[in-house]
């Protein structure tokens, strides 16, 4: 996709598509000065996930994780009419990309375990798949805003960690 996207009448030039998730497309955009991530909510079916109001769920999850102290890109603007979210851009490769290059820092696991120490007592899990994490400046950022009710089979130790090895299998979604 080329061209522009808007949030509350502010126009952003699309640099590239960063990825597609269960709930939206994320684009790297610029206002001519700064780069951002603009997430455009989509309503495509997902066979293993039920959505209600996707935009409100995303905003609720962001606020929940922010209050817990999870390192994430800041939410900068919301356009409810267009279902667009503007986020801070965290520059760098995802953990998934780094793992494919054979790069793994033990501190990343420690930082995820620290996140788990905040999430589990609150009864929550996040999507631990490595595409959702970017190390930048010594901090591991969770770049998704999704969180779900805690279930042991989906926690980091029982599900997520299998993807955090250099030989991690591809996730099929």
Label for each model-derived stretch:
Residues 15-17, 22-56:
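ATP-binding glycine-rich loop module of kinase domains
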Residues 108, 120-125, 136-173:
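C-lobe/activation-segment region of protein kinase-like
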